[in-house]
């Protein structure tokens, strides 16, 4: 079918030259290409960057060096030039030699991955730069054949794309289901029937939040030098609580709320793990970075800066607003991570409260910064938390855990379906670009 020739990608793509500092006056009026998603959609913003920039002209082919094989490739359709970080590259293309839809399908195919493995020293890298991309040799058919292949792929992918859209809808549903469960929990809706059988008993912490709050104050180990938190005004309360509950400040029900050491610790090849924000952004602790500090450094840290079992980590910079429970092992954290030390008897309910939409909304309201937003620790202490009686907290936690387990099972089913669709997609592209 048609004539196939071995050509270098650089024969039909020409890199647009030019590299600029982020504060260069030459690009001061340009908006920024903030993201190129896997569907090839370009997202434009006015967010500044600290990274060197390139310029993308209208009609250029833009490629994400990090995610090109996942589909982050598009023709920029805007009317004005934009900037992009140097993790992107911009190309002028020869449309007499290449059909762009053909090329987009090719870079998502197993054939492209095999090309990288065979021709790039060291195999596939995390980022594909123009100096690696342009010299790659590929088999390219004539233009009419390219268009025929695109037509065939499009027909075969129509059903797959429909399934993929259904998967995205299911993902959004599962995510919203999580939010609804947590919001209903902290509003007392999950335990409305439970309260009918367990009415308020004044003075009993199990059935009266005021009594529980008093008990918490007795158990707290508080720095007396710390300023008293402001009272909660009626105008601040986002919703009405059930009878027997109480609005409290986060700082009123914790022994301490602080963050990691503000001075970068000396690195060690081994020792006590040093956790950074990327280690916990998934909601669990993963020692991906394998950074360590010395035992001597660790022992000199104030106790409130050492996470312990029952504590809650809370991301306060960048991907802020993510709570993470602490298990029984020793580590320390960077300053971008908050360390919440709740009074032990309410730790489980508090963790789910911090996951809830109302706490995320408060985080969004106080986060400040331009390129990277940060939640000040002072503002974190001021978060408003609904406090139910202790026995009701335990029932809420039980219900949440059971419901979220079902959501997790649903999410696993969605992931399996998504993997099946990905394999279908690869099979279609593999067949279209099989070696000749």
Region locations from a protein language model:
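Short, well-ordered loop/turn sites that connect or cap secondary structure elements
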Residues: 50, 56, 306-308
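Accessory (non-catalytic) regions of SAM-dependent nucleic-acid methyltransferases
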Residues: 1-3, 11, 169-170, 181-243, ...
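Amphipathic alpha-helical coiled-coil/heptad-repeat segments
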Residues: 1-3, 140-200, 362, 382-436
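Non-catalytic DNA-recognition/assembly elements of restriction-modification systems
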Residues: 1-20, 135, 139, 143-147, ...
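A short glycine-rich beta-alpha junction/loop motif
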Residues: 2, 66, 82-89, 121-144, ...
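Short, ligand-facing micro-motifs at secondary-structure edges
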Residues: 22-42, 61-64, 68-86, 101-105, ...
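Low-complexity, Lys/Gly-biased intrinsically disordered segments
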Residues: 2-44, 49-52, 65, 70, ...
């Amino acid at each position: 079918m048609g004539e196939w020739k071995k050509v270098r990608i650089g024969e039909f793509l020409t890199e647009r030259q030019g590299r600029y500092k982020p504060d260069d006056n030459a690009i001061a009026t340009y908006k920024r290409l903030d993201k190129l998603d896997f569907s090839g959609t370009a997202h434009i913003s006015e967010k500044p960057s600290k990274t060197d920039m390139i310029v993308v002209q209208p009609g250029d082919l833009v490629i994400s060096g990090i995610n090109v094989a996942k589909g982050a490739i598009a023709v920029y359709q805007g009317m004005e030039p934009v900037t992009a970080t140097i993790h992107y590259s911009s190309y002028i293309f020869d449309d007499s030699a290449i059909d762009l839809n053909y090329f987009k399908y090719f870079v998502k195919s197993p054939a492209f991955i095999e090309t990288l493995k065979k021709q790039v020293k060291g195999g596939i890298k995390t980022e594909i730069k123009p100096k690696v991309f342009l010299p790659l040799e590929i088999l390219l058919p004539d233009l009419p054949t390219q268009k025929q292949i695109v037509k065939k792929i499009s027909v075969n992918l129509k059903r797959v794309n429909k399934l993929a859209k259904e998967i995205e809808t299911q993902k959004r549903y599962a995510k919203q289901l999580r939010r609804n469960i947590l919001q209903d929990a902290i509003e007392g809706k999950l335990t409305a029937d439970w309260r009918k059988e367990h009415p308020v008993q004044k003075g009993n912490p199990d059935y009266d939040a005021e009594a529980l709050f008093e008990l918490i104050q007795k158990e707290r180990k508080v720095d007396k030098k710390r300023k008293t938190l402001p009272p909660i005004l009626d105008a601040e309360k986002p919703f009405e609580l059930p009878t027997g509950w109480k609005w409290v400040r986060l700082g009123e029900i914790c022994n301490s709320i602080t963050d990691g050491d503000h001075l970068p610790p000396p690195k060690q090849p081994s020792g006590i793990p040093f956790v950074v924000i990327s280690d916990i952004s998934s909601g669990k602790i993963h020692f991906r970075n394998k950074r360590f500090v010395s035992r001597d450094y660790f022992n000199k840290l104030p106790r409130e800066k050492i996470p312990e079992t029952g504590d809650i980590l809370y991301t306060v910079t960048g991907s802020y607003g993510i709570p993470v429970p602490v298990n029984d092992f020793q580590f320390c954290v960077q300053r971008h991570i908050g360390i919440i030390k709740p009074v032990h008897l309410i730790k489980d309910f508090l963790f789910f409260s911090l996951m809830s939409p109302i706490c995320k909304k408060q985080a969004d309201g106080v986060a400040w910064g331009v390129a990277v937003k940060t939640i000040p620790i002072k503002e974190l202490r001021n978060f408003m938390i609904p406090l139910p009686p202790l026995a009701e907290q335990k029932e809420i936690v039980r219900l949440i855990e059971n419901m979220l387990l079902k959501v997790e099972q649903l999410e696993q089913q969605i992931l399996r379906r998504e993997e099946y669709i990905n394999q279908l997609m690869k099979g279609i592209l593999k067949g279209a670009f099989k070696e000749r």
